[in-house]
């Protein structure tokens, strides 16, 4: 779905047999990521969105954590959110410089950001993978599914930069019908994932999802959009 001639730039300036380009019809970010993980030759897959940046030592540092924590199926790191007017360090309180295992469900959205995610392929393949046609929260839904079946490692050092407010970003308008539908899918599939773990589900994830549901309902009320509320109900 890229419109910035990224493939042409890569082909012109980089000649490395480790770089492989796969062409497919634009079916959304979830299908593209699933294809990328499927084609990956290694056991660990580091994700990077086109608008974002890694610190020069990101892969080196994350590789060290992988080597020291082989039982983990997901590796995350803190990030900097850069908007048009300011930058914000996104690190959960008390986790600055922390390096170790975490309970992801204490704060999924602040712990997890796509370009600071390294997946263990064998664990990824045991989940439902990224859900096609979701344009919002598909990344949170995936890392939740992984965290339900494998330990999660977190590095509280901001090693990647998330760029928001970029023209043409799929997530620029959170109030479209497709975006609203994606958020409902996030909640419903998230609860299904939780209940697969046990009869009552994962308690921490259940609490987080109820918190998400409450605030999403308040947001829809504030919009005074009856259609959005009906979709929610």
Model-assigned labels for residue ranges:
Residues 1-8, 49:
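A conserved acidic beta->alpha catalytic loop
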Residues 24-40:
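Glycine-rich, basic loop-to-helix element that forms the pyrophosphate-binding segment
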Residues 45:
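Short aromatic/hydrophobic "clamp" motif used to bind/position activated sugar donors
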Residues 48-50, 76:
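Active-site acidic Asp-centered loop
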Residues 52-53, 134:
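Acidic metal-phosphate-binding loop of nucleotide-sugar-dependent transferases
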Residues 57-89:
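Conserved donor NDP-sugar-binding/catalytic core segment of glycosyltransferases
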Residues 95-181:
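Conserved nucleotide-sugar donor-binding catalytic segment
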Residues 141, 148, 163-233:
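C-terminal subregions of glycosyltransferases and related glycan-biosynthesis enzymes
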């Amino acid at each position: 779905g890229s419109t910035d001639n990224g493939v042409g730039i890569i082909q012109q300036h980089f000649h490395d047999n480790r770089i492989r380009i796969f062409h497919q019809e634009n079916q959304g970010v979830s299908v593209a990521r699933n294809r990328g993980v499927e084609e990956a030759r290694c056991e660990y897959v580091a994700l990077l969105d086109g608008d974002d940046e890694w610190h020069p030592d990101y892969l080196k540092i994350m590789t060290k954590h992988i080597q020291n924590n082989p039982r983990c199926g997901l590796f995350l790191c803190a990030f900097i959110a850069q908007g048009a007017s300011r930058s914000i360090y996104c690190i959960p309180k008390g986790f600055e410089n922390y390096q170790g295992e975490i309970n992801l469900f204490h704060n999924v959205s602040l712990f997890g950001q796509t370009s600071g995610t390294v997946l263990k392929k064998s664990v990824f393949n045991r989940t439902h993978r990224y859900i096609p046609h979701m344009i919002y929260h598909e990344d949170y839904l995936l890392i939740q599914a992984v965290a339900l079946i494998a330990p999660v490692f977190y590095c509280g050092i901001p090693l990647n930069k998330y760029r928001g407010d970029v023209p043409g970003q799929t997530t620029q308008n959170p109030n479209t019908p497709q975006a609203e539908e994606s958020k409902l899918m996030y909640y419903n599939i998230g609860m299904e994932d939780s209940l697969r773990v046990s009869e009552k589900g994962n308690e921490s994830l259940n609490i987080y999802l109820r918190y998400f549901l409450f605030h999403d309902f308040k947001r829809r009320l504030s919009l005074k959009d009856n259609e959005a509320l009906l979709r929610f109900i």
